[in-house]
Structure formats: C-alpha cells, structure tokens
C-alpha cells in the first residue's frame, strides 16, 4: 500500500491533554463510565434493563422495563430515548426516520490478527482505499476489526463461512500466522434523521435521533454533543426556566444533524467507495494537501 496521508497528533498537543486517538469498544467504555456517573450521586445506572413501553402523564412519564426479575416500573419528569437506531422510544411515538440506506453491505471480521506485523508502520486505525477491495483496520485493546466492502453478487451466508472469511483475510494481507476469528458482523450503512427530537416530555438523542456513515466517528461525537446540549437545558429547567427551551435543543441538534453531520458523512462515504480513477486522484490529492 502507498501512504496518501496521515494525521500528526502533535498538531493538537496544545489544544488537548490527550493528543491521540483511542479506539475503545463500548463494553470497556461502559465499565469506566458507570462508576464515574454514580460517583456524582445524581443518578444510578441499571444494567440489564430493557424498555418495554412508556406513558406520558402531562406532568411526568412512567416507563415499564424488563429485567431478569420481571417487569419494573420507573417514573421521571422526562424520558430521554438514547436507545439506538432501533429505538423503542422513537417507534412507540411513531416519529418518522427519513433518509436512505446505502446499497453496499459491509463485513466486519474481528480477530487476534497482528496487523502491525503484516503492515509495518501502519497506524492503529487505517483507511485503505482500493477500487477493488478497500478495507478499514481498527486495532482495539483486545481485538482487531477489519471491515471489508462486500461485492453486490455475494451471498451473505456463504460470505460468513469461516473458510471464506479466512480466504478474504488471506487475499488482502497475504500469508498470515495462525489467528482466531472472534466475531463477525454484516451490516448496512444508513443516513437518517428523526422528524423531531422532542415530543412533549420525551426526547431523542444519539443514534435514536440520527444515523450516519460511522467512518470518522461523527455518530458518536454528535451523540455526545446531543447529550451535553440536553443536559445544559435540564439544568436550566431545574433552576426554574420553562421547559420550552427543550424545543431549542430539538431544533438546534436536528439542524446540526441535517446540515453538518449528514452532509459530511455522506461525502466521506463516497470518498471511500469511489472507483473512477480521476475521482480517486482528486480525493488522494485533497487528503495529501490537508
């Protein structure tokens, strides 16, 4: 592979005490964040609770949750749906989720492959552009995720057979030492935004409110910004302001999702999958000049 561009983290050393990219899976982040949240004494994190349904009563919201001990009911002034792209909250409210789904399918193979030995000098996160077989490599603390773009004529069941997974790895990396495949996933990429981020005392944040091409981390980052914006509004309501300011949250974050996140991530998607030589050269030149 030929290096087109890399990111020098020294460029941000004066702006943050953490001038590096940390690729951390959700199950690890959750273990770190849970005690930090509970240490604030402002709330408790309940694991193993699945939302069944909810009712808004005008002054508060009640929700029924499925747990290992049966159904429990909880009550709060507001309900925030941070329950992902298949949001139960959004669906119960029949909030539209307009947008598109790309035709491409993607195959993620998680293994203990030592990619640093196969691609010496490569970064922990690599975007490898090739008109025939582009690949994303993500080195996490306990696993390496390699994402391939599937061909249009590929059968999904066939692609997921272990011998075919290994053949795909071999075709890209060449001869590899022994390794174990730990996980596989087939998925499609969506670009969608909810019709509204607020309905009464119910609000949407993160993937429940908007989906986008995950390349670049815009989904995670914009979801964190949703939460920060909404938290600031809740503090103001707690201090006596009218909850009409929740409309500001809904409008501000939805506008940002449409006008910034969706446009940027759609552009990045096309940058990854383009195959015309002239387009690829323009993209490569743009990346090299950045």
PLM features: what roles do these ranges have?
Residues 1-290:
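Core Rossmann-like FAD-binding/catalytic domain of the broad FAD-dependent monooxygenase superfamily
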